[in-house]
Amino acid sequence: MTKKIHINAFEMNCVGHIAHGLWRHPENQRHRYTDLNYWTELAQLLEKGKFDALFLADVVGIYDVYRQSRDTAVREAVQIPVNDPLMLISAMAYVTKHLAFAVTFSTTYEHPYGHARRMSTLDHLTKGRIAWNVVTSHLPSADKNFGIKKILEHDERYDLADEYLEVCYKLWEGSWEDNAVIRDIENNIYTDPSKVHEINHSGKYFEVPGPHLCEPSPQRTPVIYQAGMSERGREFAAKHAECVFLGGKDVETLKFFVDDIRKRAKKYGRNPDHIKMFAGICVIVGKTHDEAMEKLNSFQKYWSLEGHLAHYGGGTGYDLSKYSSNDYIGSISVGEIINNMSKLDGKWFKLSVGTPKKVADEMQYLVEEAGIDGFNLVQYVSPGTFVDFIELVVPELQKRGLYRVDYEEGTYREKLFGKGNYRLPDDHIAARYRNISSNV
Amino acid sequence: MTKKIHINAFEMNCVGHIAHGLWRHPENQRHRYTDLNYWTELAQLLEKGKFDALFLADVVGIYDVYRQSRDTAVREAVQIPVNDPLMLISAMAYVTKHLAFAVTFSTTYEHPYGHARRMSTLDHLTKGRIAWNVVTSHLPSADKNFGIKKILEHDERYDLADEYLEVCYKLWEGSWEDNAVIRDIENNIYTDPSKVHEINHSGKYFEVPGPHLCEPSPQRTPVIYQAGMSERGREFAAKHAECVFLGGKDVETLKFFVDDIRKRAKKYGRNPDHIKMFAGICVIVGKTHDEAMEKLNSFQKYWSLEGHLAHYGGGTGYDLSKYSSNDYIGSISVGEIINNMSKLDGKWFKLSVGTPKKVADEMQYLVEEAGIDGFNLVQYVSPGTFVDFIELVVPELQKRGLYRVDYEEGTYREKLFGKGNYRLPDDHIAARYRNISSNV
């Protein structure tokens, strides 16, 4: 049976998410991000297109590296202003039945005890349609604003994230037994206290006696996403992630990451197929090639190199305004980096431009050759990019048996891993915390 | 012109909020608190009844004082399990147009920088219908679970809350100027960077350079509620609160608090009428007195003394299981305290039982004699208590000109303080932070 492709909409609760400069495009409605209807309309559109999930990126700091200032990011709305993505979920869940919501949250700034409750609450309210994209954040401005005194190195932030997840797993998987809530009216026992356990976590970064504040939600643990392609990031993915958002735009790079993470997963006793691999993709589709190119040119017209340099500075720490084009960063010249960023050719992700058939061919090729399971679909204009994809590419993928015609029933985890799999599999590291008793 | 009474529904994102034992009542649907539709149906009902707001209490710890254990609270669902109230708001805002949402959040556990963004996000999404009930929390179990190493004394927690609010005011009122966002397409300027200011806050508890992550929302600062009646709590209310949730069930007590807080407010240069006073009230109304008494008896039947003792223990720190009835706590014997709690006579708040006329009389009397402006309406059964009030008491109040017939247009602050008052008045302490410039 042909493998169905999973499609997520890649979004962010701000004006300028990724295609910087395009807020100026006449068809772009991103300025409506503060309006609840922008989001409920988007969720309904995505459900109409049978998308798996809305993937919401997030940052809690400002890009202030480029030109040693935050002004370019602020001027061009490069992920600032930026609102809290968790606040959007319940309204979007109310207007949909199947769409899932993968929301980014950093383990660097706020305590796991409060976060574990937020995610359990959202898993309840969405009836099991919530996922968490775990990030370890790297923005100095966020460190300062959250009063982080001791700035941890890149890899140690993943060590902290390991323990952060351990605390969450103990709360989600082990603190309340499945049949703790019994609602015994006769004996006035809503919850059997003997089935609610302290977790007594004592670690390097956190002391959390527990118990969890929430009764078990449909998935208990939200579907875990991870998106860091560094060595340490891939190790973290292999240990924790059920879905990985890969970097890279060509088969070789993607395949390397896919194979590497699946291999590492075995070390943790995990079935490598218990991890779905997502690649970012930019799609500009038209009924004809010319129509697609016309759209591309209209986007290129508003494309802002300055905006992308501000984003690049925040993401890498390199202020390219201080370099000459002949300087090198790693193996690439600054001239080449800047040239790449000045063109709309999908600097980080594969760009597929053309007819529905061409786009479907290129997506199918990446899936089959790189061994990935789905895509995070980038937006140029909102909601136009998704409208085009749903009207033109989805039918083509469905014709090839590569995309669902109707939603399957069940939670997000079941839609990814099959009916009945609404909880994490036993080979996941979280499963060891299921039989926590008070004396742990 | 007769003063209109403001009515809030008093709720909590859990099973057992306040009328412990009544989760067993056949008409009570509180077990549906994990279901999004419970909340959207409630919001629609309250808007039908022209309520001002849904007031959501919250705790992030467990009552574990009574019988030196958390078991009674867990067994009887006394505010555990408890989900996060902020996650509910966007769905309820989506199905209503006027109802406001006053949500409780503690200044003790999570950093103001993340909280300021959450509230700005909700003020945007609700189009100016969000309020924040500021609490300084007191539960040891929450202190442990959030890893609070240094437990602050009661009054010092208010000092920290003062600074917490100062940080938030600087972010909400001063960081982004009203016309910072200009959306100048021609010059690719979404936001004028010179109108986005760092706040450079440096205090005893927080260092927050800023700027805020969010563009100005309709109200900028959510409507500020406060609910602590200690000496320090009233001082805090006088300085910050626009709405105060008073303790007390008789005219004398309520009037003392009202007069005291209004007097203190003058010290801060505030017009005392810029503070609305809310008393808690329990209403059991029937078309006839007998019908009301029948309801009361059905509630009394399920009333749980043990549940209330668990709540009392968590709230006061006194484990009454260790006292004999002749012991005294303050000026009241333990026997009297327990006797009060065993009857459904509104242990903390005024109980009004009877016909619509009697209930309206008693509400009008409290408003006129104690100088209060509205009520937080307690629930016995959900949604029955609110349905009865809306069907029987609201028409009676409307007949007397004491209650709106239709909603006024505008934000929550405008509905409280009049059209055009969507931002904090100039006499509020937050106003001083409006002209923050980079060198503050």
UniProtKB/Swiss-Prot annotation, chains A, B:
It comes from the Bacteria. Shows particular potential to be used for the treatment of environmental oil pollutions and in other biocatalytic processes. Random- and site-directed mutagenesis were used to generate mutants with increased activity toward hexadecane. It catalyses: a long-chain alkane + FMNH2 + O2 = a long chain fatty alcohol + FMN + H2O + H(+). GO terms for molecular function: monooxygenase activity; nucleotide binding; oxidoreductase activity, acting on paired donors, with incorporation or reduction of molecular oxygen. Changing F146N: 3.4-fold increase in activity toward hexadecane. Keywords: Flavoprotein, FMN, Monooxygenase, Nucleotide-binding, Oxidoreductase, Plasmid, Secreted. Changing F146E: 2.0-fold increase in activity toward hexadecane. InterPro entries: Diverse_substr_monoxygenases, Luciferase-like_dom, Luciferase-like_sf, NTA_MOA. Induction: 120-fold increase in transcription when crude oil is used as a sole carbon source instead of sucrose. Involved in the degradation of long-chain alkanes. Converts alkanes ranging from C(15) to C(36) into their corresponding primary alcohols. Homodimer. This is Long-chain alkane monooxygenase. It comes from Geobacillus thermodenitrificans (strain NG80-2). The gene is ladA.
